[in-house]
Amino acid sequence: MAQSSTSHDSGPQGLMRRPSRSAATTVSIEVFDHEVVPASLGTIAPILRVAAEIEHERPRVAYLCRFYAFEKAHRLDPSSGGRGVRQFKTLLFQRLERDNASSLASRVKKTDGREVESFYQQYYEHYVRALDQGDQADRAQLGKAYQTAGVLFEVLMAVNKSEKVEAVAPEIIAAARDVQEKNEIYAPYNILPLDSAGASQSVMQLEEVKAAVAALGNTRGLNWPSGFEQHRKKTGNLDLLDWLRAMFGFQRDNVRNQREHLVCLFADNHIRLTPKPEPLNKLDDRAVDTVMSKLFKNYKNWCKFLGRKHSLRLPQAAQDIQQRKILYMGLYLLIWGEAANIRFMPECLCYIFHNMAYELHGLLAGNVSIVTGENIKPSYGGDDEAFLRKVITPIYRVVQTEANKNANGKAAHSDWSNYDDLNEYFWTPDCFSLGWPMRDDGDLFKSTRDTTQGKKGSFRKAGRTGKSNFTETRTFWHIYHSFDRLWTFYLLALQAMIILAFERVELREILRKDVLYALSSIFITAAFLRFLQSVLDVILNFPGFHRWKFTDVLRNILKIVVSLAWCVVLPLCYAQSVSFAPGKLKQWLSFLPQVKGVPPLYIMAVALYLLPNVLAAIMFIFPMLRRWIENSDWHIFRLLLWWSQPRIYVGRGMHESQIALIKYTIFWLLLFCCKFAFSYFLQVKLLVKPTNAIMSIRHVKYKWHEFFPNAEHNYGAVVSLWLPVILVYFMDTQIWYAIFSTICGGVIGAFDRLGEIRTLGMLRSRFQSLPGAFNTYLVPSDKTRRRGFSLSKRFAEVTAARRTEAAKFSQLWNEIISSFREEDLISDREMDLLLVPYTSDPSLKLIQWPPFLLASKIPIALDMAAQFRTRDSDLWKRICADEYMKCAVIECYESFKHVLHTLVIGENEKRIIGIIIKEVESNISKNSFLSNFRMAPLPALCSKFVELVGILKNADPAKRDTVVLLLQDMLEVVTRDMMQNENRELVELGHTNKESGRQLFAGTDAKPAILFPPVATAQWHEQISRLHLLLTVKESAMDVPTNLEAQRRIAFFTNSLFMDMPRAPRVRNMLSFSVLTPYYSEETVYSKNDLEMENEDGVSVVYYLQKIFPDEWTNFLERLDCKDETSVLESEENILQLRHWVSLRGQTLFRTVRGMMYYRRALKLQAFLDMANETEILAGYKAISEPTEEDKKSQRSLYTQLEAVADLKFTYVATCQNYGNQKRSGDRRATDILNLMVNNPSLRVAYIDEVEEREGGKVQKVFYSVLIKAVDNLDQEIYRIKLPGPAKIGEGKPENQNHALIFTRGEALQAIDMNQDHYLEEALKMRNLLEEFNEDHGVRAPTILGFREHIFTGSVSSLAWFMSNQETSFVTIGQRVLASPLKVRFHYGHPDVFDRIFHITRGGISKASRGINLSEDIFAGFNSTLRRGNVTHHEYIQVGKGRDVGLNQISLFEAKVACGNGEQTLSRDLYRLGHRFDFFRMMSCYFTTVGFYISSMIVVLTVYAFLYGRLYLSLSGVEEAIVKFAAAKGDSSLKAAMASQSVVQLGLLMTLPMVMEIGLERGFRTALSDLIIMQLQLAPVFFTFSLGTKVHYYGRTILHGGSKYRATGRGFVVKHEKFAENYRMYSRSHFVKGMELMVLLICYRIYGKAAEDSVGYALVMGSTWFLVGSWLFAPFFFNPSGFEWQKIVDDWDDWNKWISSRGGIGVPANKSWESWWEEEQEHLLHSGFFGKFWEIFLSLRYFIYQYGIVYQLNLTKESRMGKQHSIIVYGLSWLVIVAVMIVLKIVSMGRKKFSADFQLMFRLLKLFLFIGSVVIVGMLFHFLKLTVGDIMQSLLAFLPTGWALLQISQVARPLMKTVGMWGSVKALARGYEYIMGVVIFMPVTVLAWFPFVSEFQTRLLFNQAFSRGLQIQRILAGGKKQK
């Protein structure tokens, strides 16, 4: 795309774009020619590329190339059947017609054939040969030259054929042969040029690479197929992987890819060995064994689990063992590299490898087949795609067919088999029934292989693949099913507390026999709960019964029978033992007599029942025993485990060490002490007295028709009282967890030394230790250091004598500061103040600190010295009191001497200066300086010197005379004013000068006295600039750098060096790693149009960012040397810089790539410090980082060696899956991605290429995984690996990652999202972090290294700030506690670093089943933990992360996370963790994953339970009876219980961890002020609103499914959202629920009789009204310009238009209410039976309003004369509903029949209906005493009923449509939406009347910006003023 910059007005050169219906049509002006080629014509792209390249040189040859391309396109697709082919041919033909005449005119030779031939010869001789024979050939240029020559020869042959020229000159044929051979050799490569031409490359000269390549090349003793044998003899460079390809039919590029992969792995492990291998260029067996053990650990475990012997059989001969091991590893990686989506099924890969490795062994051992009697041959082999076609594709087809049954996420999980189901088939020995070669009739293939019967080809119905060990059923029962031990524990504890409370037992009496007997009834409850779990095991997993084995069925039946037996035995024994059991029952149980001396039968039964729990307790206390038993093959242990849990491959032996167990057990025991003390004393015990009182009330006067008027004990009232309390009891552990984790995280963070350096002042105080810290942690050392906590961190001070160490510090520090300047965080002046001299002056005997530490020290020292009158030692002591002042004084003095020595060259002058300096230093050494020198003139001397330095800095030759005068002045000041005694030598020299007749320092042209201007070297310029700063900066540099982000980064980085981290190894010895970034189609780089585009307020992105980042904008202008924005826009280069500047402040791929490429920059710098000698280090890294052309070409230069090491250790792959399509369609993003590759040569892009290929006359799509890099401003293909089908068949993001995973390298892999950023100073610590893989972290080595993130989007608005704080606390304090002590950290986002080999052999770094793995990342953590991994968390390194900044984007994000958690609740992974963890770790797992969402749901349910309970009490009349009873008895506790309930809003607790983390890192005063500001900015409103989002989407996902990936905006949000948009977004999740709660509160206010004056009542009602207000109005509070009158008017018009608009096919939801309404209930169409049942059941609650309120009406008082209220009243009230329905139906039918043609008739109909309604209401007023109050109450009664009917109708949609009522339902729904819209909109409108509300809201919303002096009003009100 180098030629892609052709502008629109480029005239005839560009092809004009034609409009087309198809989005995939392939042509665009910007990137035509060689890039935009239809998918089916990919092979002609190189020809068009060559044409574009040579066009300026030989237009005719370019024309002939295009003509040949046109012919070839016609040959490939004669009928133009491929997509976009016809348009492409047309445009190409038009171009040919246009260019023909002009190119013919410029032809040099007579014929076209001669023209091409002469150009070919010229190109070959003058370019190709010249390049090839050069001393230092550029490999990339050579490769490209050979490819071009190959294309030209192809064109030459075609032209000769058309001109019927038969003979081609022999020298051309010879050249073509040479080109063809070299083309194969100079193939594009990724990191290592593993062909014969690449041997001279620097990376191939590394000893470890040589060793690995040599080991792969050892093909001794292998038999090659005949075709390969000839090739091998000819080239001699085939290796072991080529042999595997020949035998098993792998793809060529797969082999090339895995060859490099294997070489990198071997080289990496080989160089790290200790002791070092001898010789270094021979691959050590230890390196091979290390890689092999990692690669095959899972495979060996799998074989052991299935009781099979593994196939890794080694030969007897020692010399062949290494070769055999490499063959096995190569085979596995080749299988993995071609497995595509099957990589998500690791045990399926184990099965394939098991059989192929067995065949490999047979091949090499010469085994004979038992069946055929011949030598064993591979079952699948032959051509290059045999393995893909015969092994992978059949399995892929099964996976694809099952995925298609998912119906795009709409089908139930039980209807199809996901990746896990299919993989788990290979956890059973049944998988071997597939055989090898695999039989098509094996179980796995039943779903797709229909077997033909008979000649007519009738089909047998396909068998079902079926679910495996688990079925994801949509039900809330999963919450109990997955965490049954937790709920059992809570229920038993609750039962025990209730027993103690009602028995009024004091805690000290708990060991009384009768109390213990009463408490022992909990075991009966436990037995029933266990029975429930056994039943759920069968019911929830029943859809997978096809795959159940007999042992599974037996186990389930036995468990149900045994648990049922206990449910009978325990109650019977208990009843027989207790005294209060009925006498008849005791007689009936007389067959259970007690024998004397034997304990009671119940006690024995309980002991027997608890026996298995004793065993479990022993295994809990000794986790090592549990691990051993779970991994054991002993049958007794298998039987034991078979009963307690099904035997599955994962989840075994994952228990932690004894110490870890003790830590998290203590955490939970302390938490439970607090939780149960609170629950018992403040919840359960307080309700005992009110409960007894309520149950003792008789004679309740009911206000409605009571169905059970004579029922005793008022159970309804008791339930209303207890239900909210019990719900809070189940939820409040989450609150206690928040408190305890905050305290625990704070303590751990403090011990981790977080926040020790948090301000610039703290940094200054610790700066002297910094060089030591740098050299300890960032510079490798041979000394080993013990890790661990110490109270103080001390580092050996780097003294001036240790110059190399000081130089290393300066290189690292300066590179960090330079990166700050590049990012525009600091200005040029600040950079100068922060830099340390790159090249230290050998004459200085001290460390040169950065000037910002020494600023203003010299002026202060001068003032001090000028006024000092006492002894020298006192003055020096005062100066030395400030270490930096001492350094500044010494450095300035030494620099003063250095300047004079450099400047003065006259003999006499040099002697004079020497005498003065000698005199000064002599006096200093004798402590007599102050007595012999006057100090008062010192400032005058200094000012002269400052002037001199200023002149030297600019080095203007015209100022020579001024320099002479200054030197004379300075000499005079010293000799006349300062020296008290005359120096004899000076006098003599003065006399000598008089005699010569010239003045001092003046000199002559022949004999100058001074050298001015001095010789300008970089070192001289640096020294003079620094000296000038030290002398002139008078103000303190306390606030340097001024930028807050720069301050934060420096503070965190320096603080992290005082934390505990591993020492860094040398770069060559470090673990190599890759970074993988999934990218779909988000923003890459903002275009110029994006920058200039204004929103509705006239604000452009550039203007916005100028106001948000004013200091960075100023620094940017300074860097470009521009005055303002106008001058920036004058140059194309500056516009590009501006685009980059803006893109680096958004969430773009450009920002992410820049951040990740810091890794490479850091590695090169660190490798320089490792590899450079002392001279090179003292000369500085700058000399290397700006190499000469010679250095770049030389393979021996230090520069190329650094490049080689960086290449080997770091790979960055951006997986841009749509790049191919974007390129073909001319999408700007493709050009941006190419530019990224050009600017970052080591960046690789992986994409999925869809190519149309013709097979058997049919065009079909073929998919490839392609890896590309940039060469010579074009993208160049490195590998192209064919896939069995489309890569995306499940969740898109994990499958995008998966396809690119094969192109990553190294032993660690970092997953980075494209909204992340990185910093150079953090990248420097990557080596340290990777060493954590080798550190001791408990029983198991780490498999995922987690670390913290900094949220960089928090500075814009209050919302962004809340979100930023919330996210920051989660990724720091939250995950710190999860990792230690709780040991349940998983994988939550994307800075985590994976143990790559561990994960690629166990299913990858995410899971991809549609729907269930919506939160794909956390499943990587689940999978890692279940497969005995270990996830850690580290605080000393961080990356940047962007978050959504507008309320709607935040809500979309939270909806996505809530849906993901809903799916997790149903998942097998969580079920297995819940059952395989020990009890306390299971508690941790629950409360840190789905437990938070369940607790949030319980909070909302508590509010509902409380209010509906109150509604029941008030409407039924029970509450009035209770209040009267309490008043009569004087029972205050009963009154209080009625008035208050424990209603807690969990959202407010989100601030706890935030406050702790801010306190730790920025000080507790800051934390407190931030907390207060957050409250003032309505943070509680935001968190309460978020609670509603979480609960709605979590609950809906579990009930109905329909979860999907929700793309959230990543843009800059200062945008007003329209009311209609907010309504669509929040109607169902917040507004409906808020309205319902509001109606409940109003009803209770009207009918309630509880004590309204109590504080408890006020608190509860206040908090509930706050919840309602938050849910209804938060979207308006947090909407920019939400209360601006004009916007309100526009919003209302827009909403009216939207709600009135009719829907229809193709009408989007944002244009029509009908379309939106249909979309909103779509989930009900696909919901299961239970989902629909619960939806209807929950809707029934709305009927209680009508039932209760109709009996309160004035109208019905007549019917209340009797003792009982008649049910007829309620029945008659339904007539109103029926009447309304009839009216609606009449209107609906009338509209259909009359509205179009008989408008008058329709109006008359509506008039009659209106008159009729008025007449009926009037009669009711007159005859039945109806009042206005009755009408208002009726609305409260009937509106909820109508809503209930509407909800039920939506569920019963098919029925409604059948009976013809759907139109009425729609009309009713629209009416309700109108009412809801008006109710919500009215208060907003009223507030908008007052202008100050809008101003207040803006201030509230953008306070963060205001505090930094920003003017958001101008941004909102219009940047138009700027124009």
Curated annotation (Swiss-Prot):
Glycosylation positions in this chain: N1710
Keyword Metal-binding: no
Phenotype of gene-disrupted mutants: Plants develop deformed and inviable pollen grains which do not have exin.
EC number: 2.4.1.34
Gene (name only): CALS5
Family: Belongs to the glycosyltransferase 48 family.
Source domain of life: Eukaryota
Protein name: Callose synthase 5
Gene3D superfamilies in alphabetical order: Vacuolar protein sorting-associated protein vta1
Localization per Swiss-Prot or TrEMBL: Cell membrane
PANTHER family named in the record: CALLOSE SYNTHASE 5 (PTHR12741:SF106), LYST-INTERACTING PROTEIN LIP5 DOPAMINE RESPONSIVE PROTEIN DRG-1 (PTHR12741)
Residue ranges annotated as Extracellular topological domain: 503-521, 581-601, 680-719, 1508-1535, 1588-1630, 1679-1732, 1788-1803, 1847-1873
Cytoplasmic side: 1-481, 543-559, 623-658, 741-1486, 1557-1566, 1652-1657, 1756-1766, 1825, 1895-1923
Record keywords: Cell membrane, Cell shape, Cell wall biogenesis/degradation, Glycoprotein, Glycosyltransferase, Membrane, Transferase, Transmembrane, Transmembrane helix
Substrates-to-products reaction catalysed: [(1->3)-beta-D-glucosyl](n) + UDP-alpha-D-glucose = [(1->3)-beta-D-glucosyl](n+1) + UDP + H(+)
Pfam family, one: Vta1
A GO biological process held by the record: microsporogenesis
Ranges of biased composition (kind: Polar residues): 1-10
Region (Disordered): 1-22
